[in-house]
């Protein structure tokens, strides 16, 4: 999987290249990260990449020309182009699974007051948001997207079964988890987890997943019940 990030602040991604699991995946060539500076493509002699908004309005807007030329240069494979935007569909686990099947993804990061709508409407395939709030740029959102999608790629986590027990993978939240010591400040690990009975342990975990989802995310729990009933199970 290759991620091509178009940004005005390429140095923002230096940390990601050496960060934990994702950094190791890059070093082991499981994923590839290409960070491209949009400013390198501007034809403005002052290296300007933004301008005033037609019709008036606060702030400046990123112009079409440098973004378009950048896309034309780097997206030789006609890969999916994702624009990080608060107007996009909110990122979830199912979208991460879907994107992990792509061979290459181009991620456009906006800044200032955003990007000229002609770029979004005609040269981007999809807008994705990481939540219903506004940030100063798309870089942090792009890092979240890269991290979430990369975890779905074979060998990135070391154990390909790991992500399948994550919260949201099968709609339900993850079960409660415990490690040593067996008793901490009077709080004990559930006895069944120490029993060695794998069938009972799995039953406990399933119940814990259901309870956590119902308690913490009623909206997801109702969605789970709806899909379960539709499936006839």
UniProtKB/Swiss-Prot annotation:
Gene3D superfamilies: 3.40.1280.10, tRNA(m1g37)methyltransferase, domain 2
InterPro entries named in the record: Alpha/beta_knot_MTases, tRNA_m1G_MeTrfase_C_sf, tRNA_m1G_MeTrfase_TrmD, tRNA_m1G_MTases_N, tRNA_MeTrfase_TRMD/TRM10
Coiled-coil region(s): none
GO biological process: tRNA N1-guanine methylation
Keyword annotations: Cytoplasm, Methyltransferase, S-adenosyl-L-methionine, Transferase, tRNA processing
Job description of the protein: Specifically methylates guanosine-37 in various tRNAs.
Protein family: Belongs to the RNA methyltransferase TrmD family.
Protein's UniProt name: tRNA (guanine-N(1)-)-methyltransferase
């Amino acid at each position: 999987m290759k991620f091509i990030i178009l940004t005005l602040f390429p140095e923002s991604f230096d940390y990601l290249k050496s960060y934990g699991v994702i950094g190791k995946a890059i070093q082991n060539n499981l994923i590839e990260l290409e960070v491209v500076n949009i400013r390198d493509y501007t034809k403005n002699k002052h290296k300007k990449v933004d301008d005033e908004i037609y019709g008036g309005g606060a702030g400046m807007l990123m112009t079409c020309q440098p973004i378009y030329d950048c896309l034309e240069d780097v997206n030789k494979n006609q890969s999916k182009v994702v624009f990080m935007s608060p107007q996009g569909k909110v990122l979830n686990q199912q979208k991460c699974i879907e994107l992990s099947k792509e061979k290459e993804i181009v991620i456009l990061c906006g800044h200032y007051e955003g990007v000229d709508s002609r770029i979004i409407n005609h040269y981007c395939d999809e807008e994705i948001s990481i939540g219903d709030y506004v940030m100063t740029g798309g870089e942090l959102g792009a890092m979240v997207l890269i991290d979430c999608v990369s975890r779905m790629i074979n060998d990135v986590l070391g154990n390909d079964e790991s992500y399948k027990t994550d919260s949201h993978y099968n709609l339900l939240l993850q079960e409660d988890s415990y490690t040593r010591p067996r008793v901490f400040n009077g709080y004990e690990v559930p006895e069944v987890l120490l029993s060695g009975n794998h069938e009972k342990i799995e039953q406990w975990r399933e119940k814990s997943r259901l309870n956590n989802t119902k308690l913490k995310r009623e909206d997801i729990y109702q969605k789970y019940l709806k899909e379960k009933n539709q499936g006839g199970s």
